[in-house]
Amino acid sequence: MKPFFWRIIGSGSVNLVFIHGWGLNSCIWNNIIIILSNYFKLHLVDLPGYGKNILYKEYSFSKITEIIACKSPKKSILIGWSLGGLIATNISIVYPEKFKGLIIVSSSPCFCEKKDWPGIKKEILNNFSFQLKNDFHNTVKKFFNIQFLGTKKNNNEIKKLKNIFFRQKEPSYKTLSSGLKILKNIDIRNYLKYIKIPTLRIYGNLDVIVPVKIIPIIKKLQNFNINKNIIIPSASHAPFLSHPFLFCKIIKYFIKKFN
């Protein structure tokens, strides 16, 4: 199998491992790399089937968890956005000794709506899966549009996402479909209690994919003393794109507090 590509930028003593979301690749972090690489060593992951790992055909949630955990430096800090946040959460549960911090961005331990749990309606995810097969490009564009509903910078941010998606070789239908299955089926809420490392969760107050009303529920599920939640006003599902400087300031402050 082709070696797993892993981009490293910066030379700080603290290692940050970045995991992107559905449909995109590690270029999604370009806005903040310029800032954070002055302070930390950044490890930028392309998930299997995406970006530079487009030929790496490994789609199971458990295998992706294993690949990233094994490749990560010891005592690094995981940063995961959306689908990447779900993967980062699982890594910190399965490999509790390897990491010293967890930063979750606009993500949920269960993306699908359940009883007493806010999330995406199952029929919407099913519909996306169906449309993906029949109209690949428009379905991806539609998903990007949903991520920025209500934000003032709507058009600029959507354009950035589309540029990242179409700049490199497109992920296959199988890659995107497998990612949607993870979003639809994975539920690790009951395992949050096993996370015993400092955790920061960043949300956008306008996010319709991961609504801020999950915050008090997650607080009860992950009852650990260093568990910080921050809501960025006027931000939606990708706050690091709409508010890069504030986002980096939050991350630097969090790491400084416990490092």
From Swiss-Prot:
Keywords: Biotin biosynthesis, Cytoplasm, Hydrolase, Serine esterase
Residues bound to substrate: 22, 82-83, 143-147, 237
Pfam families attached to this UniProt entry: Abhydrolase_1
Positions in coiled-coil regions: none
Gene Ontology terms: biological process: biotin biosynthetic process
Residues annotated as domain AB hydrolase-1: 16-244
Broad class of enzyme this protein falls into: hydrolase
Entry GO MF terms: pimelyl-[acyl-carrier protein] methyl ester esterase activity
E.C. no: 3.1.1.85
Residue positions of the active site: 82 (nucleophile), 207, 237
One Gene Ontology cellular component annotation held by this UniProt entry: membrane
UniProt pathway: Cofactor biosynthesis; biotin biosynthesis
Family from the record: Belongs to the AB hydrolase superfamily. Carboxylesterase BioH family.
Subunit architecture: Monomer.
Role of this protein: The physiological role of BioH is to remove the methyl group introduced by BioC when the pimeloyl moiety is complete. It allows to synthesize pimeloyl-ACP via the fatty acid synthetic pathway through the hydrolysis of the ester bonds of pimeloyl-ACP esters.
The protein, known as: Pimeloyl-[acyl-carrier protein] methyl ester esterase
Source organism (scientific name): Wigglesworthia glossinidia brevipalpis
Gene expressing this chain: bioH
